Every structure is written in C-alpha cells, then in structure tokens.
Amino acid sequence: MIADELTYRIRGAFGFPPTAEQEHAISVFTTFMADRHEHAVMILRGSAGTGKTTLAAAIVRAMLSCQQQLVLLAPTGRAAKVFSLYAGTAAYTIHRRIYRQKSLEGGFELGYNNAHDTLFLVDEASMVSLNGEGRSLLDDLISFVYNGRNCRLMLIGDHAQLPPVGEEESPALMSSVLSSYGLKVHESTLSEVLRQSQESGILYNATQVRWLMYDGRCELPKIHLQGFTDVKIVPGDELIETLASSYSKVGLDETMVVTRSNKRANIFNQGIRNQILWREEELCTGDQLMIVKNNYYWIKPPATHSSAGNVAGSSPQQGESEGVSFIANGDMAVVRRVRNIHELYGFRFAEVTMTFPDYDDYELTATVLLDTLTSEAPALTRDQQEQLFTKVMEDYADIPRKSDRMKALKEDRYYNALQVKFAYAATCHKAQGGQWAHIYVDQGYMTDDMLSTDYLHWLYTAFTRATEQLYLVNWPKTQIEEAED
C-alpha cells in the first residue's frame, strides 16, 4: 500500500482539512503501516475535543476503501457500541474476540488468531490493564494479535482518563511498556482542542481539569458556567425533578449518575427507583441492571472463535448479538420479566428474562442473585461467596468423588447465578468507556487534603461521559468560577 495513496484517502474521509496535529498523526500512521517490522505497534493518544474520534473514524473508512482487513475492539460492550457507531462498522469487546472456552474444564483461555494481514484497532485503550492474576489483559491482547500472520495493533485512547484499577498510568498508552514486549512503537498525541469543541461547556471544563493534571497543580478546579448551556449546577432539593426531566427527555438508558463509591451509587439507585420510578418491588420489568461479575455459565459459546471471519466491512459470522460467549462485568441489561422470587441457601434468587442493549438486545433468561442489588460491596464478598459454596456443596454430599461434586457445582444454577446491581448510578470506573446524553456527577464532600491526581483523572473521566448535558450535583460554590461583570 502506497503511503501517499493512504494519506490521500484518510484526508478525503475527513470531509474538512485536518489540523496540523491530525496531519502529523496521519503521517505517523502511514509510516506505521509501511513499517516492515513484524512487531510494529501504534499509539494514538487524544483528549476530549482534540479530534481523535474523527481521525480514528477517517482511518477506518480509508482502510476499508483500500480493502484492508480490520478488527475493531474495545474493553467493554458499551465502548464497543460507541466505537462501532462513530467508525461506521462492527466493533467487538476484547474479551469476546481473543478468548475461547476450554472444552472440558470450563473457563476461558487465549484463543488462536486465524486472521492475517489484519489491523486490530483498540479504542478506549486507557482501560486495558497490566495487572491481573497471572497474565494480564494487555499481555493476552498483544500475544493474540501478533500470533496472527502479518497482523498489527493500533491502540487509541485518552491518557487523561482514569487508569485501570491499581495502576498509576494507563499502561497500554505508554511506549515504554509496549517496547518492553519487543514491539516497535509509533506514537502520536493530539492535545489541541478544536475550535468547535471550545463552544462546549463540557469540553471546556474537562480541558481545564486536564491542564491542572498536566501542570502538576493539585487544586480544586473552578467550573466555568458563563456562556454555556450544557453544564448546570443541581442543588440537592432539585435533583429528583431534574433527573425525572432527563428520563422524560432522553430516556433511562441515556441518563447516568456517576459517583465516587459503590455506597453512594447504591443510595442513588434506591432513591431513583423509589422516588422517581415509583418501583416498590425488589426487581421490576424495565429495571436497568449492570452485571458486576463475569459469568461463563448462562451462555454456551460456539466451539470455534475465529477472528478471520469477523473483519470490519464484512458480514460477520458471529456478531456480538449472535456470538455472546459470556456475560462480562460491566455489561448493561434491561429486565423484561421477573418470576419465581425465592430464598435458598440463605440468599434470595429470581428467574429473570433480560435483554442486553449493547449486544443488539440479545435476550437471556437466567437465575439472578438479588442480594447484590442493594449491597454496598461491589459484588458478593469473599465470606458470602464461601457461604454459598458451602451450602450448595451440601446438596451434593451424596456424590462420593470430589471431582464429580465439583463438576456438579460448576453446573449448579444457583452457584452460577448472575450477580447484578441497579444501573441508574455507577462508579466512574464502571461508567468508563460508555457515553450518555445526560450525566449527573456526584463528587461527594471534598476537602483540599483529598486532592490528588487520581481525583482529577476521576473528574475528567466523569465529565467526558456526557454528550449533551452535564449536571453537577450539590457542587460547592468554592468550586464555581464567579461570573465576570
């Protein structure tokens, strides 16, 4: 592929002249694609409002016009859906593309990359972790891609967002980390906020937070309201009315409250269900749920999981709706039917039919554990998990062989019940990768001694989840920039 031809096609896919930074990124990309090094990789960093999304979409369109095979990936289902919408072609979650089910013992292992001459593009790469028990997601992603013949990887992300839990920075966006894998790194960073983005109060204030972060100034940012209609302060006594208005205007699925803790998210979820949606039952039709623990039991994936047949621009043999191989932590679901609520083993369960909006409304009926809905813990605690294990195993005490008892346990619907929470409010890590029309940010009580770079990452990530309207809940006056006379 001739670099000049590719440059011409990318520029043409823009529809308007690229900025100087975008031109440089295009040059880096064409050099990356022309590099004969078999382990070349590219990092494209860009903060909100810098045109990263526009550039990535132009690259996808240009590559497809050249008949180049692509696989678009993202860390979560909602992030994959967003990537698919702006790129104009199918995108998949990383986990569902690179792992396959073990045939006998259950669980998943790294799959085989059948693709060749394929570019893998990963959006929201700031969420890809290096930590983990044994091999990390970044380890497996790199191994999977470069095990394919003449395949290469492009990582796209915003390094101002929250890094993965337990990390100080986002490892997938660090050239030093990628170089340690023996990869030849090409990189480009977009930092200039585009003129049209400066008209957005959401992006203006997110950029102010980003500047504080990179200037090394840990101070409470002042929110600028003057001249913007898309950022508003919501006092506590107006929150119910304002949230109800958002639900009426854009819907439950386009409104999200972002909080700093599971405890706060739980309080908001209960308040929203009781005082706005008037839902008195434990779980109702129409309730929005979030899966809080990976579950491999309820979906039986296909025996083979080839990436070669799932390139962008083709008709995938398995789209996310047809090839959902497991239910992932962070997946969103909508309750369609609730029946047979009952107590067993000291826990409460229900049979729930639900659809998954980020996977073309894939429908599933499963046993759901109700106890996690309102608990302050992220999922079942270790003690609760051990209690459930012990109680279920008692039912199989008549099976003489331990291996057969363990097999029965793995096939037990109660031990494998879905762990869920309500999804009207969530922590920032849970919301990361997704976008909603209306975002409500609850930072809780803040003092100067609570300031840190982590807080600024959190605030920036929370702000940039909003696409239309940002509401700041109970925001202190000391954090609001006074209007100029």
Explain the meaning of each model-derived region.
Residues S27, T31, R36-E219, H224-Q226:
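ASCE P-loop NTPase helicase motor core
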